[in-house]
From Swiss-Prot:
Domain of life where this protein originates: Bacteria
Protein name: CFA/I fimbrial subunit E
Compartment list: Fimbrium
Coiled coil: none
Gene3D superfamilies from the UniProt entry: CFA/I fimbrial subunit E, adhesin domain (2.60.40.2520), CFA/I fimbrial subunit E, pilin domain (2.60.40.2040)
Organism of derivation: Escherichia coli
Amino acid sequence: MNKILFIFTLFFSSGFFTFAVSADKNPGSENMTNTIGPHDRGGSSPIYNILNSYLTAYNGSHHLYDRMSFLCLSSQNTLNGACPSSDAPGTATIDGETNITLQFTEKRSLIKRELQIKGYKQFLFKNANCPSKLALNSSHFQCNREQASGATLSLYIPAGELNKLPFGGVWNAVLKLNVKRRYDTTYGTYTINITVNLTDKGNIQIWLPQFKSNARVDLNLRPTGGGTYIGRNSVDMCFYDGYSTNSSSLEIRFQDDNSKSDGKFYLKKINDDSKELVYTLSLLLAGKNLTPTNGQALNINTASLETNWNRITAVTMPEISVPVLCWPGRLQLDAKVKNPEAGQYMGNIKITFTPSSQTL
C-alpha cells in the first residue's frame, strides 16, 4: 500500500487551504487493525479514533471519486456493523455522521455487547476548501462547483461508549464496509479488526465463595495415637484478574504474621506466643499443584494453566453486573504435630494476588 503524505499550506488571508498528495491512490479492498487501550473501567472513557481522515482514494487528474460511499453489509445485523447498506435516495447530501452499531465479543467468555461507532466522510478538492462532514451513504458533494478528486474516511468510538462493556477483558469486533462509487461501481470492502483491551483494576480480587469477607478456618486437630495430632481443612477461592483471565502471568504471595524467615507457617497459642504449631499450605490452581513458601511469591505463567471450562470458572461478584471468569483454586492447610500443649492456637495468612493486568 502506498504511503500517503498530506502537506497543508495555510493561507489565513484568503480563508482556504490548498493541499498536495504525494501519490494518487486507487480505492480497493483493505484489511486494517486497530487496538484500543489498555483502558481501565475505573477511568474516564474518551473518544477513541479508529480511522482519522484516512485517505481512501485520490486522483488529481479526474473526478471519478466524487461520489464515493461507504456502506455496511447489513442495516440490521450487528456482527460486522449495522448501518445503511444502500445509498441515500436521490441526490441529497446528508451532512453529519453515520451511526454504526457493532457487536463486540469478549475473547474468553464469548459474552457479546453492542457499541455505537460513528463515521463520516470528507471529500477532497484541488482548488477549494469544503471540509464538511458527510454521512457515509450520502450523495456526491460539490464545493464552489468543483467536483471532488478524492475522499477520506473517519471512524471513532464516542466518549463514554466503552462504559457499556460490563467487565474487563479483550473485546474484539470486525467492522466491514463496502466501498462504492455511487450506484455503479464497487471498489472493494474495508475489513477493520478492532480490539479493545479493557482492564478492571478496581475489582482485582481473590473471591472466596464460602465467605462474605475474610475466611476463618479451623484445622480440626485430632489425635491419631502416640501423641501425634493431625488436622486438615481447605478453602475454595477464585482468582479474578479484572481481565477475564487474559493475564499472561500471576504472582501470588502467602505470608503470615510471624517474624521468622524459615519459610514455614505458624500458629501461636493464644496468650502465650512462645508456644507454636507448624502447618503447611498447598494450592491447587486450575489443575496445577503449588506449594507456597511463607513470604515468597509464586510466579505463574498462565500458559502453563489449563484453560478449558472445567478450570476457568464463571462467578457472580457483588460489584459486577454479570458473571465473570476467574481461575479456581483450593487452598489446603495441613498440620501434623507431636505432643502439642493444650489450648487454642491462632494465625493469620495474608494473600497478595498480582496479575499482569495490574500493570497494563
